[in-house]
């Protein structure tokens, strides 16, 4: 059985009303946001280079992520990487990036400029590569893009995942995720 962390439930609650934003399409399924990564397919295995360094087996390279079909009023996006399986099911925040201009459309692997990096689980303002326990089941890494009506630069530096979600409440226009798996 897969359990959800508190922060994952909070993100779902934040985005729960966003589906109604899509225009009617005459009986066809509505077209919403699309999030992809060239590093892995949805529910695919994440390459080791995106894991943490040292015993974690990687190079601590942040994942590339792209977004399309944003809501019309989107001004900025936030990118979040979390592991709901980590910390004994309480979840781990690996990457908090925000104040990203919506029209940018992507972040490349290991890109660091032109946006604000928030605080990860270790208290650092940086991408933190994956490092699940050796021999543990594959962890699910949820890479989420949230579109908002906030102008790029509107949010202060150093926000944690929870603080960012609180700041986006009432400003989120939609969100979408891609999930990757990683184990050691």
What are these regions (language model features)?
Residues 1-4:
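Positively charged n-region of N-terminal signal peptides that target proteins for export
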Residues 6-9, 136-138:
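Short hydrophobic/aromatic-rich motifs at helix boundaries and adjacent loops
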Residues 7-17:
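Bacterial N-terminal signal peptides
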Residues 18-184:
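N-terminus-centered regions that define maturation/targeting leaders and the start
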